[in-house]
């Protein structure tokens, strides 16, 4: 299965639980930066929040990156960020969850799934400014092509558990507070940077990158 198919299945899963309506990504629908072509789509997930996907290809097809972001403003889930990168024979899987809970929720089912799959090769991401709000249920793996099928299966099950968790059933009591918590992460990315953030800031400048992040990728601003 290609990584694009994995992300498509994730979108379909969201759509079954929280019907998706595509929104216009405007000037960001198709962009180029640092030798990469990006295709970006944004959705409103009914009863869930903002969903965005980004597909990037470059370097004569030698690199492919898929990103799926969920800012769950209407359910008390953590902010969800999925990245999958195929490059130079390596397959990297990163799922990051950020604490945007209005009230602490139980997502221990994800930690149990991580533990069941601890044999999959880990990837040390080092230390970052956002570590204090990144949840322990986050995942970072890196392997070769022979690991791709296992990564696919792990991701599908992890995402299923995420959207079927008890937290996914909790309707947010205060959307404003929820959005403020998500904004802490988004504004932190813009201020402190990150791999993708830095690429966009260098290519488009800070104001345009801020617009992409706030209005499209994370939907913290309408």
Where are the regions a protein language model picked out?
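Polar low-complexity intrinsically disordered regions
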Residues: 1, 180, 221-222
